[in-house]
Amino acid sequence: MELAKSFEPAAIEARRYPEWESRGYFDAGLDTSNPNAFCILLPPPNVTGTLHMGHGFNQTIMDALTRYHRMRGDNTLWQPGTDHAGIATQIVVERQLDAQGVSRHDLGREKFLEKVWEWKEYSGGTITRQMRRLGTSPDWKRERFTMDEGLSKTVTETFVRLYNEGLIYRGKRLVNWDPKLGTAVSDLEVVSEEEDGKLYHILYPFSDGPVGDLRGLTVATTRPETLLGDVAVMVHPEDERYAHLIGKTVALPLTGRHIPIIADDYVDREFGTGCVKVTPAHDFNDYAVGQRHQLDMIVVLKLDGSVPAVAERYTTDGQPREGVAMPAGVAGLDRVPARDKVVAELEALGLMLEIKAHKLQVPRGDRTNVVIEPMLTDQWFVAMSKPGADGKSITAKALEVVASGEIKFYPENWVNTYNQWLNNIQDWCISRQLWWGHRIPAWYDDEGRIYVAANEEAALHAWKADLEAEIARLQGEVQSRQSQGQTAEQYPDLAERLSVLHARYEEGTLRQEEDVLDTWYSSALWPFSTLDWTPEWPQKSNPALDLYLPSTVLVTGFDIIFFWVARMVMMTKHITGKIPFKHVYVHGLIRDAEGQKMSKSKGNVLDPIDLIDGIGIDELVQKRTFGLMNPKQAQSIEKKTRKEFPEGIPAFGTDALRFTFASLASPGRDIKFDLARCEGYRNFCNKLWNATRFVLMNCEGQDCGMDPHEPGTCVPGGYLDFSFADRWIVSRLQRTEAEVAAQFEAYRFDLVARAVYEFVWDEYCDWYLELAKVQIQTGTPEQQRATRRTLLRVLETVLRLAHPLIPFITEELWETVAPLAGRKDADSIMLARYPQADMGRIDEASEAQVAELKALIYACRNLRGEMNISPAQRLPLVAAGNAELLGRYAPYLAGLAKLSEVEIVAEIGADELAPVAVAGETRLMLKVEIDIAAERERLTKEIARLEGEVAKAEGKLGNASFVDRAPAAVVQQERDRLAGFKATLEQLRPQLAKLAGR
């Protein structure tokens, strides 16, 4: 097949990917006789989502690992799938309905869910189509969705089991509440940013009048409207100012209630007045204080964020008490107008002592931008710290498997984050007040009793069994009464109760829980639910589970170590007894070139598909300004975008983008994405393409030394006469193969990319191809044959080595190169064996010779530069040194240093006017006529310029302000410049001195 003149990625990508997929190259290996297994789980992206740079980055890493292990011959599974993304998906569909003037409540639950499933079918394939564009190779035949029948069954089975073990319970606790969505939300869905607010200083008068000079306690708060739910004022137990007041009460303004003054270590004595209001139903810290002090909880906001006429009141353990009437002027108001009303009334009473401007962290819903309210509601929870039947909590087990090294983090420092979160864990709220998601498998009877079961039939069965037991007990009591001679008129309540129970039994209905499970619950089961887990495993064999649980590595961002990683460890270990994965590779978050987070509101989002295909500036502006939460930002975003990308974004192709992602995968929290890197790696792909064209032009139709031959014939004059340059590139290849393998094992994909890049660009293309040209032009037939063989064999190996990072170009080139290189063992590079270093082929002598040759060539090039001689002008070289070595190097020197001839002499006279370069034991001089006056003038000017540069650099580096304040890299750059200027001066001054007397 003839290779195109230039690399055209779009055409290659469109052709190659369908070939790979249709031929089953991505299918999971299920060879149980092969003990080597590699499995990686795709963190399931939202089904309604689109590919963003973070997806592109971690999927490149996952695919590189998958291709690497597949080529090593391991059983390999990359498990793909998508997440139903409860809140995100429901919001999308509700917005669509809203545009039609319809609400989900107008449709009803069943009809609304039909609409969501329609949307899922329509939109769900977007992200997997985009993954294909990235060249990813998961086993698409095993693609899963978190609400598939099998996964949903696993969700139900685990919920029932945990409930029966006492590890799932229903309770009234404080949660993050989004009043607009009307549901509890996770911490990950809450964004806290600093905003301008106010700090209100309110006087709480003592119930029994002033105490000394004090009328009461002054409390500072940013939420005066929650004053209505206060149940105490707390001070620090060691605060001498208030020690004598502990145990007294204050009159709570506007309410007519009196609340105690309590002592608690939570109080910061240095902040404000040192007095803090306690509102357990509306603040997470206050909730904890309330639990410690057995304080009631008064809920002064309804779920929509408005103040009720009568606030619900609960004991510490969530039992209802008599409600608390709210002030008439405040009841019915939303929380913000309620705040204004409370402030006005406090001012009228003279109790508002001061209002100050104040910066505060305001929690807002990441999807609604509405202020999140800590809300006391009935929710379902997983008990994170409660010991199970084995005496250990699920959190303790999750900590143990990391502490023991059974699960390892890369980089290791993320263990601290994992431990910190788990050591400060709270029970996990797993219920959401949504319609889209896994409906909680719990049913209620008319008296509020809960029945958790796999299905309604099982719940009814349990309920009827309870009813039958109660009926039997009551009937036994009736019989006992009758045996004592009592008649029905004497136990009417008992008869009435029996009548009610019989009626209910005949009716036989239960009400299912309306809430659905938190999306993270089903995500926590992902490591085993996707492998078709059943409770019978491992007693009942399952090849996928047997081979791939635990999986090898999880690739994830640091932001979800707690929300996803830790929960997978807990749930998988508790349910299956196995860890979910052996390694956790934690990467940073992709940011723009300036280190800013990519976000719609900042207008700096990049779509990886746009980097692959390119996009015009007008279309890019339209994408960035469409659908903004704040349309006023459109103008500034457009201006910034047009300045940054005046011509739009060029097409880089998938391979260049993947190589860029891999090169950026260094340890750290932030990854700055610079488009210039993409351009550099596109150039790399072009260089690899052109190098292959060169090799093919010199090898196709030629004797490339691929015929069978005896090992002893690879000697001078034999069938293959390998030069020191041939042995050098093979030796360097072994070192590169070893480095790549080591860095893949260490999850240092940046170093994998660097090793491949430096070998291909710096050693194979820049040096070996040039050396090979000389050998093909000047060598014997045996040397030419050996050179062609080396060109092909090294190139073919390089293509396999680079394939996990840049799959498309390597497949395209390998198809042509492999047959010429004598490889006929695979139909695709994907199925070819990954290169493994043969350390016995490292040739240090040849490496030393090439290093010496390079030094000579650099010296010749430097001489040209010093004398301002055009690179195109061929000149003779005079060389003094080891005549045998120089004779061997002469053809290469002539070819690579653009010399007309190389004259080897015993020594170069001291009276020669031309500059002489020294490289090791060799002295080199270009034979050129010197215009003494002109050269003297040139050297004088150049020395003066360099002395000026030295003075400037020394002045900068002598300035303490520059050295202390400039970035370290800038200071080092200045030091390097100074060293370079001085080194050049050391070369030029002797040359000028030589000319001085002429």
Swiss-Prot record:
It comes from the Bacteria. It catalyses: tRNA(Val) + L-valine + ATP = L-valyl-tRNA(Val) + AMP + diphosphate. One of its GO terms (cellular component) is cytosol. Keywords: Aminoacyl-tRNA synthetase, ATP-binding, Coiled coil, Cytoplasm, Ligase, Nucleotide-binding, Protein biosynthesis. A motif ('KMSKS' region) lies at residues 597-601. One of its GO terms (biological process) is valyl-tRNA aminoacylation. InterPro entries: aa-tRNA-synth_I_CS, aa-tRNA-synth_Ia, Anticodon_Ia_Val, M/V/L/I-tRNA-synth_anticd-bd, Rossmann-like_a/b/a_fold, tRNA-bd_arm, tRNAsynth_Ia_anticodon-bd, Val-tRNA_synth_C_sf. HAMAP family: Val_tRNA_synth_type1. Catalyzes the attachment of valine to tRNA(Val). As ValRS can inadvertently accommodate and process structurally similar amino acids such as threonine, to avoid such errors, it has a 'posttransfer' editing activity that hydrolyzes mischarged Thr-tRNA(Val) in a tRNA-dependent manner. This is Valine--tRNA ligase. It comes from Azoarcus sp. (strain BH72). The gene is valS.
